[in-house]
């Protein structure tokens, strides 16, 4: 049996069941485990309760139960500058960002990793559902976990080799129900705690209300692709490509089909809408992605390859051909079949079978050579 007692793992504990079980499993495997609660946001919910205080109390209970030391670290300043300012700037540009991807690359696997190394950690761990394997050359590869329904490789897609080689994913071969069972069997305080949902710093709060506290909303016209005014929008930042809900538009003489957001015109402050799920304006043949990241290192030359991809969380993989450009670290990605509602600002994530190759940020979508008016 391997002696792990001299290997220190610092576990980022959120106060949720997943990171609680991660810490427990590592402790059971004999590692020298230290729990750390990260406070990334000054979060008070709509009822005035500071959820971080409640979460830290749960971390204390779990750490005491499994017998590990615990600390709390505040990354609010780093989070504001590296994640939240990016989030706001993307919305100002009319894009729909994914701050959780940025939070992982800049905070959880950067600021937290640095802090853990100062605690003499050999590895870090959290409650993510992902898996890593090491090849014969010593390179660490990111793989999909056993629980495909909880697969979080999408959100980890912009980490690099130096980051993932320092990570253990204790939940790699477990399903969420199994994690709950382990927590219950070991009497962990978080065993029945519900999962957090939505963007981490918004939590259960109303999204529009939250965003309006930081960005002034400017109402404007809702127009059809040919310019006909059909309504008024509350602010372009509140809408995303392909959105159906919340438009407040009814059927017309021509059609009873629901309306969808098919574009944005920032200069005119107009939201472009059209009836019908299959609006041609929602389908792209290719996209342009920037800031590409690959787990095993960026190619030092242009390369073309076929793989599968996701351009939003939880969607099924779609076949793509990737043309990577080494000079500016961008990629042109061609879909095997036209793809619906490709949204600038979201993450593009590439897969080869069970392996997650990496990803980048979606900048634009095209129908052949024509750029879709998505921002």
Curated annotation (Swiss-Prot):
Pfam family, one: tRNA_Me_trans_M
Name of the molecule in the record: tRNA-specific 2-thiouridylase MnmA
Entry's Gene Ontology BP terms: tRNA wobble position uridine thiolation
Catalytic activity from the UniProt record: S-sulfanyl-L-cysteinyl-[protein] + uridine(34) in tRNA + AH2 + ATP = 2-thiouridine(34) in tRNA + L-cysteinyl-[protein] + A + AMP + diphosphate + H(+)
Superkingdom of this protein's organism: Bacteria
Disulfide bonds: 103-200
Family recorded in the similarity comment: Belongs to the MnmA/TRMU family.
Cited NCBIfam families: PRK00143.1, trmU
Membrane-spanning ranges: none
Positions marked as site (Interaction with tRNA): 128, 346
Binding of ATP, residues: 12-19, 38, 127
Record's keyword annotation contains Disulfide bond: yes
EC number: 2.8.1.13
Region called Interaction with target base in tRNA, residue ranges: 98-100
Protein task: Catalyzes the 2-thiolation of uridine at the wobble position (U34) of tRNA, leading to the formation of s(2)U34.
Region of interest: Interaction with tRNA: 150-152, 312-313
Molecular functions per Gene Ontology: ATP binding; tRNA binding; tRNA-uridine 2-sulfurtransferase activity
Alphabetical UniProt keywords: ATP-binding, Cytoplasm, Disulfide bond, Nucleotide-binding, RNA-binding, Transferase, tRNA processing, tRNA-binding
GO cellular component terms, semicolon-separated: cytoplasm
Compartments in which it is found: Cytoplasm
InterPro entries reported for this sequence: MnmA-like, MnmA-like_C, MnmA-like_central, MnmA-like_central_sf, Rossmann-like_a/b/a_fold
Catalytic machinery residues: 103 (nucleophile), 200 (cysteine persulfide intermediate)
């Amino acid at each position: 049996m391997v002696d792990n007692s001299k290997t220190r793992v610092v576990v980022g504990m959120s106060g949720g069941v997943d990171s609680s079980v991660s810490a427990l499993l590592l402790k059971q495997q004999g590692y020298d485990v230290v729990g750390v609660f990260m406070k990334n946001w000054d979060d008070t919910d709509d009822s005035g309760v500071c959820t971080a205080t409640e979460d830290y109390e749960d971390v204390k209970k779990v750490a005491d139960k499994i017998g590990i030391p615990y600390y709390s670290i505040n990354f609010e300043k780093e989070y504001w500058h590296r994640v939240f300012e990016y989030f706001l700037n993307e919305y100002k540009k009319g894009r729909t960002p994914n701050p959780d991807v940025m939070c992982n690359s800049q905070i959880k696997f950067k600021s937290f990793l640095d802090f853990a190394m100062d605690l003499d950690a050999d590895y870090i761990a959290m409650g993510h559902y992902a898996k890593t394997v090491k090849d014969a050359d010593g390179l660490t590869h990111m793989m999909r976990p056993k629980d495909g329904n909880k697969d979080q490789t999408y959100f980890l897609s912009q980490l690099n080799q130096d980051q993932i080689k320092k990570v253990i994913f204790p939940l790699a071969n477990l399903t969420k129900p199994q994690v709950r069972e382990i927590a219950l069997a070991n009497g962990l305080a978080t065993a029945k705690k519900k999962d957090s949902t939505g963007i981490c710093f918004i939590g259960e709060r109303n999204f529009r209300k939250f965003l309006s506290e930081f960005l002034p909303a400017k109402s404007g016209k809702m127009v059809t692709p040919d310019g006909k005014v059909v309504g008024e929008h509350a602010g372009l930042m509140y809408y995303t490509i392909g959105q159906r809900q919340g438009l407040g538009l009814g059927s017309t003489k021509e059609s009873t089909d629901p309306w969808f957001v098919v574009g944005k015109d920032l200069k005119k402050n107009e939201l472009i809408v059209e009836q019908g799920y299959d609006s041609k304006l929602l389908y792209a043949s290719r996209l342009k992605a920037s800031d590409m990241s690959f787990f095993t290192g960026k190619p030092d030359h242009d390369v073309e390859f076929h793989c599968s991809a996701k351009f939003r969380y939880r969607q099924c993989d779609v076949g793509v051909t990737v043309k990577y450009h080494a000079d500016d670290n961008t990629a042109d990605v061609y879909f095997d079949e036209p793809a619906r509602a490709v949204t600038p600002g979201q993450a593009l994530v590439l897969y080869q079978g069970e392996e997650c190759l990496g990803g980048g940020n979606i900048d634009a979508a095209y129908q052949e050579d024509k750029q879709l008016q998505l921002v």
